[in-house]
Amino acid sequence: MMRNILNEVTLELEEKQITAHNMLPEGLTVQGNSSLLYSIFRNLTDNAIAYAGTHISITIRCFREDERFYYFSFSDTGVGVGPEHLSRLFERFYRVDKGRSRKLGGTGLGLAIVKNAVILHGGTIFAKIPPVEVWNSYLH
C-alpha cells in the first residue's frame, strides 16, 4: 500500500524535491479496514508534502511488532512544528499556521481523520519532536 501511495504522489515529491524512504518490510500485511489504512498513510504523506517544505526526506518504518500490533513511525526532516502544537495536532480543524493552511487549501481535518482511523483499529497515534530536526508521528 505504501509503495502505491508514494507512486501516486511522485509528481508532488519531485516538484518539492522530497525524497521518500519506504522502510517497511517487503510483504508486510496489516489486518484492518483497507480504506482506513490507506487514509492513514495517505493523509500523513499528503501532510508532509504540503507543510514540511522542500528539499526534505520522509521516512516510513515499522520499528516494532508484537502479537497484537505493528508500530509505525512516519517522520520527515521538514520545518516541523513547535512543541506548543503537539498536543493539538490531531484535533479537528486545528491548524498550526492558519494563514499557510488557508493558502494551501487545508481543511484541518487530515490528521483528525488519521487519529480516528488509528483509534478504530485499536491503536494510538502521537507526534513528538526528537532532538534533531525531524518530525515524527508514531502509531500502533
For the regions a language model picked out, list residue spans one by one.
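Short helix-loop "hinge" at the ATP-lid/N-box region of the Bergerat-fold HATPase_c
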Residues: 48-49
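Conserved catalytic submotifs in the C-terminal HATPase_c
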Residues: 14, 19-28, 65
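Short conserved segment of the HATPase_c
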Residues: 81-93
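Short beta-strand/loop element within the Bergerat-fold HATPase_c
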Residues: 55-68
